[in-house]
Amino acid sequence: PIEGAKAEVIEYNPGFTPDNKYVEIMDIVKSVTDTVDIMDAKILVSGGRGVGEEGFGMLKELAEVLGGEVSCSRAVVDNGWQPRDIQVGQTGKTVRPNVYFAIGISGAIQHVAGMEDSDLIVAINKDEDAPIFDVADYGIVGDLNKIVPALTEKLRAVVK
């Protein structure tokens, strides 16, 4: 404050009246989802870019056989193949399931940060040098389009 300075107070009314709420509700949208929160899942079958858009059908089938849920990497969400609410990783969710299947996931550090505390990690990738194998308890190197259906059928025979 400047000593001795004076200011004029001007009252201004923008036209508001107490009886008007000044808000118009245009629409009410309730968010409903059919998915389970992947953070609560005991078994996750997670797919990456290597699965491709059409490959998520076989992942869903494997998850159903195991009583698990499907999740994915950021690359999958960025490509618009799966919704963001099932994304695992630094920019997704951190999960700690009993079993985590990393299928077609290279193992970028951002993804690993969201799943490395899983009790058991099974990785399936065609690249034997993929970083995901560094954190996996079990690794299968090969064509996921052949391995996943075969694994699903074998598990279907023993899991009732």
Sequence positions of predicted segments:
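N-terminal glycine-rich FAD/FM-binding segment characteristic of electron-transfer flavoproteins
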Residues: 1-160
